[in-house]
Amino acid sequence: LPRLQADAERHEWPPRWLMGQLREQTVLVVGLGGIGREVARLLAAFGTCVIGTSRRGEPVDGVSELVHPSDLADVVGRVDGIVVTLPATAATEKLVSAEVLDAVRPGATLVNVGRGSVIDEDALVTALREGRVGFAALDVFAKEPLDPASPLWDLPNVIISPHNATLTPAEGR
């Protein structure tokens, strides 16, 4: 999306490029509560290989492999995308740490629709600048609203939304 937006701003029609297909991807869903289970189900419906984190190890429809949250650094190098859906707790604070982000497969996509405190934002900025994380879609942040001085605003490989992922038409009324 950032690439397409940049081309549009320059009024350029770029040559076509090969895009990855969901059925060719492996995605790690960090947190298999209600939202995480639904994300896993939808990804699996498209043929995506889904790995999920679980402290209890209970099977989840659509999830082909379960890992403990403490093993994130061991698994992120095998995935193309990471979707974080965890709540903010003492146990989840900065769970996606510098160590985890250092181990990410170069160019991986990171989506956070859980809580901002789950990701070490400073480490994420570094990972985005270095290309370890190729793209991030962030709906939540450690402190909201996101500080206007945050470097996340200026990174071309980041899309920011204002904690809008859970807003439904009923809530908007």
Could you tell me what each predicted segment is?
Residues 32-33:
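Glycine-rich Rossmann-fold phosphate-binding loop(s) that bind the pyrophosphate
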Residues 26, 48-49:
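Residues at the starts of beta-strands that form the adenosine-phosphate
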Residues 40, 44, 128-129:
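Gly/Ala-rich phosphate-binding loop of Rossmann-like dinucleotide-binding domains
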Residues 144-173:
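C-terminal helix-to-coil terminal segments
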Residues 54:
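Conserved acidic E/D residue at the C-terminus of a beta-strand in Rossmann-like folds
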Residues 1-26, 41:
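Phosphate-binding beta-alpha-beta segment of Rossmann-like dinucleotide-binding domains, i.e.
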Residues 57-151:
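Rossmann-like adenosine-cofactor binding region
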Residues 36-37:
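N-terminal Rossmann-fold NAD(P) dinucleotide-binding loop
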